[in-house]
């Protein structure tokens, strides 16, 4: 029997949803913590299903109606589960743990309340805001925007392509995506080489590259394709360059708060102090065993963002092939011109 029509699913809830999108090692945790400190905003979570659906649509594996219907199911279910604190991370040392939530007392009251209906109705009536961290889906924003419309607040966390910390992070993950159960990255299988879903224009080149070349290709694709989405004004994407955020955090957190129509409370100021912002230098972050495991080190001295970018480029020249180095230099030049208040 042939199907009589196309399955669809609308959204029944109206809570706003914040996305903070960026690459691994790009500074998302810092900004997500600040956003989580805003009134009505929930602790940030990572839900791979949203990235997977967006990737499937971007690669034309599913149509827009299917993508939107799946996202509507996902978002409505997430709102209900969040109201009851289901699917929350209670591991104390994880960055995404509820113990890192700037307003922990709110969650303590919620977790001790056994009345499901009361919790859900309160969540809806207070217009609580969901908060997702995502990885490299700015250029895949269309189905998310179609599903949420003016409920969506999409932030794009950028970091200069000269960042050695970010480059090393991406290189390591390029060997893991599509090859282990821990991550939910959708990939193209090109003769046994796994190409992550956010690569659309450089699939064959990525498949034939080594891990550091892949890191550069990822940055190139994410930046250039993401810029096209930013230029489409219907999405109203908030761009947050890491090099500006760490020195002037209020500017960017106020952009989000104004969309939510909330003021910056003492919770925000306290979280700024915990995150050591404003900072004396880019890497002057709070100590973290997790970040240290990925290569972060406390700076021995404080230097300007301009000098750090120059030092990182010089370090890259020591081990990148000349053709890849030229691509990095072009990306850095464009990044500095677009976001920063100095010239190299």
Model regions and ranges:
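PAPS-dependent sulfation machinery
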Residues: 47-132, 189-204, 309
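PAPS-dependent sulfotransferases, especially Golgi type II membrane carbohydrate sulfotransferases
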Residues: 1-18, 195-213, 220-223, 227-239, ...
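Conserved phosphate-donor/acceptor-positioning beta-strand/loop module used by diverse small-molecule
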Residues: 133-136, 148-170
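Walker A (P-loop) phosphate-binding motif
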Residues: 8-38
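Short His-Asn-centered micro-motif
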Residues: 21-22, 131-137, 157-159, 241-243
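Hydrophobic/aromatic beta-strand patches that form the interior of the parallel beta-sheet core
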Residues: 18, 42, 153-155, 238-240
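PAPS/PAP-binding and catalytic site of the sulfotransferase fold
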Residues: 27-40, 144-149, 169, 239-264, ...
């Amino acid at each position: 029997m042939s199907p009589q029509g196309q399955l669809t699913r609308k959204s029944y809830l109206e809570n706003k949803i914040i996305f903070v999108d960026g690459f691994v090692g790009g500074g998302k945790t810092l900004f997500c913590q600040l956003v989580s400190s805003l009134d009505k905003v929930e602790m940030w979570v990572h839900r791979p299903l949203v990235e997977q659906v967006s990737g499937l649509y971007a690669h034309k594996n599913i149509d827009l109606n299917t993508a939107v219907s799946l996202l509507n199911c996902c978002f409505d279910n997430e709102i209900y589960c969040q109201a009851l604190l289901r699917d929350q991370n209670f591991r104390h040392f994880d960055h995404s743990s509820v113990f890192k939530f700037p307003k922990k007392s709110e969650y303590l009251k919620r977790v001790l309340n056994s009345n499901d209906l009361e919790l859900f109705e309160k969540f809806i009536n207070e217009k609580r805001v969901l908060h997702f961290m995502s990885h490299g889906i700015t250029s895949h924003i269309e189905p998310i925007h179609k599903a949420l419309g003016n409920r969506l607040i999409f932030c794009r966390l950028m970091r200069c392509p000269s960042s050695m910390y970010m480059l090393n992070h991406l290189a390591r993950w390029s060997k893991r995506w599509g090859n282990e159960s821990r991550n939910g990255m959708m990939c193209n299988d090109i003769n046994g080489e796994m190409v992550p879903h956010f690569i659309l224009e450089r699939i064959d080149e990525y498949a034939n590259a080594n891990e550091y070349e892949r890191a550069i290709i990822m940055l190139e694709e994410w930046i250039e394709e993401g810029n096209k989405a930013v230029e489409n004004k219907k999405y109203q994407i908030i761009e947050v360059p890491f090099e500006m955020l760490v020195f002037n955090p209020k500017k960017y957190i106020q952009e989000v708060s104004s969309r939510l129509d909330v003021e910056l409370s003492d919770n925000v100021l306290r979280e700024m102090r915990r995150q050591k912002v404003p900072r004396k230098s880019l890497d002057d972050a709070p100590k973290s065993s997790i970040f240290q495991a990925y290569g972060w080190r406390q700076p021995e001295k404080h230097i300007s963002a301009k000098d750090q970018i120059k030092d990182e480029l010089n370090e890259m020249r020591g081990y990148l092939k000349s053709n890849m180095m030229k691509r990095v230099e072009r990306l850095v030049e464009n990044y500095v011109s677009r976001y920063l208040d100095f010239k190299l």
